[in-house]
């Protein structure tokens, strides 16, 4: 093995423009890949009320349909809700439309479809019911991300409720839009994130290197059971 390259972590953003540019799941063993299908499924489930439990479970268990081949394990799936482009987590529950006028492109830049929900009010609000709903959805998305099988990727600032005021293409904003304001951090959201990370570290079952199975052709016991809220199968 190469003395330098063998010690590196290889992570792909597995898509590009043009024919054949989308290559999710096609990288060889040793690589980990951003999983945009995880992102889209989780956003649709929590924010749009779309999708089914089977699809949710498939992503929650590290997307075996994309990565369970050639000896690849569940850690190959880099799960994320938000990334460097697109809405931040707070903006994801606060805006249904991009607000990119400050970028100087007449609000034509940035993706127009974000699978977001503003909880009834576009942008900032003082309505306590809307704020409570937004906070609950952020916690739900963070909990799903940090308790899923696979490799979690958390956008810097999402743990403190950072907002870009609806700008979903802030690459050119070297100012308060993108700078993290720690003195204004959402302390409750940060505490929640810390507890979730501690839980993930404490329990190896939440970060397994082997695939979960609901049944086994070999007669071995299943490694996971999916139950209703009341505990029934």
Locations of regions flagged by a protein language model:
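Conserved alpha/beta catalytic core and glycan-binding cleft of carbohydrate-active enzymes
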Residues: 2-156, 160, 169-173, 207, ...
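Glycan-recognition and catalytic regions of carbohydrate-active enzymes
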Residues: 131, 138-166, 177-179, 183-233
